[in-house]
């Protein structure tokens, strides 16, 4: 046999081997490979671009909190408190505690248990990529899911946030787990998947309540809309339909997450309705009017909110989203093509998430702070870390 003939034969055997591997594997190879690429990219960026962390001091808070959790502590009790006061920690009679919920810190603590805090970053990036593929596959098909995962890897916001110790990537991972489990529960009718959805959204609420609410709002709307028939059946013949069972499972586990969050508040702040960030800065939160944190104060008017959020969204679509400036037109073309084929309810829910994230963030003054000086696009944390409050987009 000639050398060319042997090369052709070897290529044929390789192709046949790949086909057999695809047939034998219950998981498609493309999303698995993309998840591994995401993990490698996150770790590489974390040790090359951010070896000493980013300019966002919140990273230190989450790493300190992770170290505390590994030691079984919710409070720090230094011998001389005035000489040891970590960034964004609240002073209380029980000791010092961070202004953030412990969910993100727990994720990073798992990385330390595996060998290093940084090991959590590639794990979150891989899980986020795989879950996004799963969500889009449920709503569209395998090919579109792969395209979505590739688009995620082409997003500077995803790459940067996956390489730093901040809460946005881990919370999005939980939100995507909720979406995937919810879609899978509706397709299969299995209550177990509905329970997973509830647990995931409950954890997301514990991590970042407002972020979870904005993401879950379209799903809640769908859940309520589809309950009319099952509730009527329950009133008429006392039968509990599968849809109602799934809704109860999701709501129950989700409310458990809310209860855990409120219980944590009660332990650290003394009031279940006062979150740690409110104890640290009562005017640092949702709403219009006077907003304040540390020595920085602004009158967050609706007009200022709209201007700031318009600038943030523009930064997302022009610089930080998938494929940069061409990403938004491609997304519009995709939406138009989907509309021509008639929207499935899953697709409508995902479109609703984009709307709820954009509109809901207007009510949060953090999108003003991330910009720094409005007239200077190179100012503020958005210049180096992106519009991270819109990470779910």
Describe the predicted segments one by one:
Residues 213, 359, 370-393:
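Hydrophobic/aromatic-rich transmembrane helices and adjacent perimembrane loops
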Residues 117-143, 177, 181:
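Transmembrane-helix motifs of polytopic, lipid-linked glycan transferases
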Residues 57, 157-171:
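Short acidic/glycine- and proline-prone juxtamembrane loop motifs at membrane-interface regions
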Residues 128, 315-361:
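Hydrophobic, aromatic-rich transmembrane alpha-helices
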Residues 266, 271-337, 370-376:
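Membrane-lumen/periplasm interface segments of multi-pass, membrane-embedded glycan/lipid transferases
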Residues 137-142, 178-193, 204, 229:
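Membrane-interface transmembrane helices that cradle and orient dolichyl/undecaprenyl
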Residues 148-153, 176, 180, 197, ...:
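Short helix- or helix-capping micro-motifs
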Residues 16, 185-191, 214-258, 262-263, ...:
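Perimembrane helix-loop-helix junctions
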